[in-house]
Design a protein with these regions (language model features):
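Short linear S-[DN]-x-LW-Φ motif typified by the pepsin-like aspartic protease active-site region
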Residues: 1-60, 73, 77, 81-83, ...
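Active-site alpha-helical segments that house and flank conserved acidic catalytic motifs
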Residues: 15-17, 92, 111, 130, ...
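Glycine/small-residue-rich loop that forms an oxyanion/phosphate-binding "nest" at active or ligand-binding sites
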Residues: 68-72
C-alpha cells in the first residue's frame, strides 16, 4: 500500500519523526510541495500516525513490541522529499530501521538510531546531533557551527566536515574525522577505539589523555596555539594528519 501526503512548505517549520523498524529517508529535491511518501503493508501504513500542529509535521510508528500486529517479516519505507529552499529544525529517530539524509539545510538537527545505520550525505545547520548505539554512523559533507556525534559500539566515519566546534564520542567503535576547514575546538572520547583526524592545519594544540594509547602527528606541529584537539581514551591511540601531507595522500 502507498500513502502520499503533500504539504505547503511555508506552513511547516520543523519535523518530528519517531519510527520503530521502518526505514526513513529524507532528501531535498526539485519539488514545490513537501512530500511524504509511505510504502508498506496496509496494516502497517494504517498504524502510522501523521499530523501537522503548530507548524510541526509529526510522523510516529508504534514500537515493535507495542504493535498489535507483530510479524516475522515486516517492511515499510517512509520518504520525505523536501524543497531545496526549505529551512527548519529536524528531529528524527528510528529503533532498528536505516536512516538516510541527503542535502538538507536547516537550523537544528537531531538524528538518532538504536541499531539501524545512520547515513548522512550533505547536511547544513547551526547545530547537528547524530547518535547511534550499535549502528554504523557514516557522515559526509556536513557543515555546522556546532556538532556532536556519538556511537557506543558502531564505527564513526566523518568526511568533508566543516565545524567551529565538534565533539565525537564512541566506546569501542573506531573514529575517523576528515575536516575540510580549520576549526576552533575538537573533542574526541573513546574507551578502546582508535581515533584519526585529518584537517588542513599546520599546527594545533593537541592533548591526549590515555592509559595505553599513543599520539602520532603527520605534518601537524603540536603547539600552544592553533585549533584545540582534546582526546580522552583508555587504550585508543590518536593520529592527527595535515590534509595534503604525504601521509594524508597515502590514506586516500
Amino acid at each position: 500500500m502507498n500513502r502520499n501526503e503533500h504539504y505547503d512548505p511555508s506552513l511547516v517549520t520543523g519535523f518530528g519523526i519517531r519510527l520503530a523498524w521502518a526505514t526513513l529517508e529524507m532528501m531535498t529535491d526539485d519539488v514545490k510541495d513537501l512530500q511524504l511518501l509511505v510504502s508498506g503493508s496496509q496494516d502497517d501504513v494504517d498504524d502510522l500516525r501523521i499530523s501537522v500542529e503548530n507548524g510541526r509535521l509529526s510522523v510516529s510508528q508504534p514500537a515493535y513490541g507495542l504493535s498489535t500486529r507483530i510479524a516475522t517479516e515486516r517492511w515499510m519505507q517512509v520518504t520525505l522529499r523536501i524543497p531545496r529552499d526549505w529551512r527548519g529544525d529536524v528531529q528524527a529517530s528510528t529503533m532498528t530501521g536505516l536512516m538516510q539524509v541527503h542535502g538538507l539545510s536547516g537550523t537544528d538537527f537531531s538524528l538518532t538510531t538504536v541499531s539501524g545505520t545512520l547515513r548522512v550525505n550533505g547536511l547544513s545547520g547551526m547545530s547537528v546531533t547524530l547518535h547511534t548505539v550499535s549502528g554504523l554512523l557514516d557522515v559526509c559533507g556536513i557543515t555546522a557551527e556546532k556538532g556532536s556525534m556519538r556511537t557506543v559500539s558502531g564505527d564513526l566515519s566523518l568526511y568533508r566536515g566543516i565545524f567551529r566546534q565538534l565533539k565525537l564520542t564512541s566506546v569501542s567503535g573506531m573514529i575517523v574525522a576528515g575536516l575540510d576547514e580549520a576549526f576552533e575546538a575538537l573533542d574526541i572520547n573513546t574507551v578502546s577505539g582508535a581515533m584519526s583526524v585529518q584537517a588542513p592545519i599546520m599546527r594545533a594544540k593537541i592533548g591526549l589523555r590515555s592509559v595505553a594509547g599513543k599520539l602520532k602527528t603527520e605534518g601537524v606541529e603540536n603547539t600552544e596555539d592553533g585549533p584545540a584537539i582534546s582526546a580522552n581514551s583508555v587504550s585508543g591511540s590518536l593520529t592527527v594528519t595535515r590534509s595534503g601531507s604525504p601521509a594524508a595522500s597515502d590514506a586516500t
